[in-house]
Design a protein with these regions (language model features):
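Hydrophobic transmembrane alpha-helices of multi-pass small-molecule transporters
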Residues: 1-28, 170-178
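Transmembrane alpha-helical segments of multi-pass membrane transport proteins and ion-pumping complexes
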Residues: 9-18, 35-36, 40, 58-62, ...
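Transmembrane helix-loop junctions at the membrane interface of multipass transporters and ion channels
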Residues: 159-173, 220-232, 281-292
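Membrane-interface junctions of multi-pass transporters
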Residues: 19-27, 37-82, 176-237, 258
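Structural signature of hydrophobic alpha-helical transmembrane segments
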Residues: 1-9, 48-65, 109-125, 174-185, ...
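Transmembrane alpha-helices that form the ion-translocation and gating core
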Residues: 81-136, 229-320
């Protein structure tokens, strides 16, 4: 029976991803929504089984390994100053704002800090697609976004590791540090001449099995219990998630000497949360730092930010310099 559940989840996630792409959305959004639809929150075709989440964890590790394999350290040298400023301010602003917001809602300090870490992470997979679509990937804005995204991912992982030290190891165990290890391993393997073939193979394996299981399993954990009671919080979280990245990364780029128009595009390009934020949120749930209600809210906000980002970015890219 478990094999059947896996089959349904993978099929639904892959189909959802394809449908999302046709609608101009991120593949990840489609897979997440598919998990929500077939999971306990809606159709209840696939229960939230422990084995599904265990296999999904391997998807996380492969995802982070591939992130390391795809990270071009040389890319950081191009527009390094602007990328650094955009990444740092784009991380600092949500890292400060979300804990304050959480404390206002009565969340304990330890958990409030984790809120900031979750929303400090950025995913630019959808941004890269939009940049490619409009031929702006090699533009100044495109280059800064790519460089900032690399730094952003590294900082997000370091924040998780630092948080583990902050709480004295009581919440995050060795399993929680494994994504960081996988990312580092990817960076090392990238130096090998055959790394491109290895990346192609691991991407193929992940694309058809582990990735849809991971993203689909995230959807299985979403609950709409007390959804309407949390509607105001969801709206606030989404607005803050969009604003902190847009203004944080945008201001950072401007401080580095990038023009206002390009800086706005850079800010918009950093709005989307995705894989990294989901990985961090998953760590928080599995280690009981956040509860299921918070986790569900985070997933919904991550989905909304991924949908909103290209809507803001597309018109701004038409104005940027090449």
């Amino acid at each position: 029976m478990e094999i059947l559940y896996f089959g349904v989840l993978i099929f639904a996630a892959l189909a959802g991803g394809k449908l999302a792409e046709k609608m101009g959305l991120s593949n990840v959004v489609g897979q997440l929504l598919a998990g929500i639809i077939v999971g306990p929150a809606m159709l209840n075709w696939v229960p939230s089984l422990h084995i599904i989440h265990v296999i999904g964890e391997y998807g996380v590790l492969l995802l982070m390994l591939n992130a390391g394999l795809e990270t071009d350290v040389k890319q950081l040298k191009q527009n390094m100053k602007a990328a650094t400023y955009a990444a740092v301010l784009g991380v600092v602003l949500p890292l400060v704002t979300f804990p304050i917001l959480a404390l206002m809602f009565g969340i304990q300090l330890q958990t409030a800090i984790f809120w900031g870490i979750v929303f400090a992470a950025t995913s630019v997979s959808i941004t890269i697609a939009v940049l490619n679509e409009q031929g702006k990937l090699a533009s100044t804005a495109g280059s800064v976004i790519l460089g900032a995204a690399v730094l952003d991912d590294v900082m997000a992982l370091l924040l998780v590791a630092g948080y583990a030290m902050f709480i004295g190891g009581s919440g995050l165990g060795p399993d929680s540090v494994m994504p960081l290890v996988a990312f580092g391993l990817g960076l090392l393997v990238r130096r090998w001449s055959g790394s491109s073939h290895f990346l192609e193979l691991s991407n193929s394996i992940g694309k058809w099995t582990l990735f849809p299981i991971f993203f689909g399993s995230i959807g299985l954990m979403v609950s709409f219990d007390n959804f309407w009671n949390e509607a105001v919080l969801l709206v606030i979280l989404t607005i803050v998630a969009v604003a902190t990245k847009y203004y944080g990364a945008g201001w950072g780029a401007q401080l580095a000497g990038i023009g206002k128009t390009d800086s706005r595009a850079i800010g918009a390009g950093m709005i989307s949360r995705g894989e990294m934020a989901l990985v961090i949120a998953q760590i928080g749930l599995s280690t009981k730092i956040i509860n299921h209600m918070e986790f569900s809210s985070f997933v919904i906000v991550i989905i909304l930010s991924t949908i909103i980002a290209p809507i803001i970015l597309r018109p701004l890219l038409e104005q940027v310099t090449d």
